[in-house]
């Protein structure tokens, strides 16, 4: 398979709206060629006996039982707040009222 050309890199750069210098075109052409070669080697692996998966290992959620535990009172939680109102943290308004 022929390598990636400067023109192909320039085309990709235009599509991505990137401005590349002439020396960068050569540099990225080599890098893209290496990446495509690596993907081609992975594609050559015998995969007929391997089922498609989204992860190499099975995923399991580790859950703990819900337990009621002591926590802060509203007064304790608000004690370090710079501003509070009606037992709530008061923060500056960031959204309009529209």
UniProtKB/Swiss-Prot annotation:
The keyword Magnesium does not apply. Keywords: ATP-binding, Ligase, Nucleotide-binding, Protein biosynthesis. GO terms for molecular function: asparaginyl-tRNA synthase (glutamine-hydrolyzing) activity; ATP binding; glutaminyl-tRNA synthase (glutamine-hydrolyzing) activity. It holds the Pfam family GatC. Gene3D superfamilies: Glu-tRNAGln amidotransferase C subunit, N-terminal domain. It catalyses: L-glutamyl-tRNA(Gln) + L-glutamine + ATP + H2O = L-glutaminyl-tRNA(Gln) + L-glutamate + ADP + phosphate + H(+); L-aspartyl-tRNA(Asn) + L-glutamine + ATP + H2O = L-asparaginyl-tRNA(Asn) + L-glutamate + ADP + phosphate + 2 H(+). Its EC number is 6.3.5.-. GO terms for biological process: glutaminyl-tRNAGln biosynthesis via transamidation; regulation of translational fidelity; translation. It comes from the Bacteria. Residues 70-98 are annotated as: Disordered. InterPro entries: Asp/Glu-ADT_sf_sub_c, GatC. Allows the formation of correctly charged Asn-tRNA(Asn) or Gln-tRNA(Gln) through the transamidation of misacylated Asp-tRNA(Asn) or Glu-tRNA(Gln) in organisms which lack either or both of asparaginyl-tRNA or glutaminyl-tRNA synthetases. The reaction takes place in the presence of glutamine and ATP through an activated phospho-Asp-tRNA(Asn) or phospho-Glu-tRNA(Gln). Belongs to the GatC family. Heterotrimer of A, B and C subunits. This is Aspartyl/glutamyl-tRNA(Asn/Gln) amidotransferase subunit C. It comes from Streptomyces avermitilis (strain ATCC 31267 / DSM 46492 / JCM 5070 / NBRC 14893 / NCIMB 12804 / NRRL 8165 / MA-4680). The gene is gatC.
């Amino acid at each position: 398979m022929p390598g990636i050309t400067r023109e192909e890199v320039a085309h990709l750069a235009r599509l991505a709206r990137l401005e590349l210098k002439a020396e960068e075109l050569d540099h990225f052409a080599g890098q893209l060629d290496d990446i495509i070669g690596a993907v081609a080697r992975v594609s050559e692996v015998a995969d007929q006996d391997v089922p498609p998966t989204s992860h190499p290992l099975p995923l399991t959620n580790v859950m703990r039982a819900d337990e009621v535990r002591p926590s802060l009172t509203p007064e304790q939680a608000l004690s370090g707040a710079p501003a509070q109102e009606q037992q709530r943290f008061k923060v500056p308004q960031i959204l309009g009222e529209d």
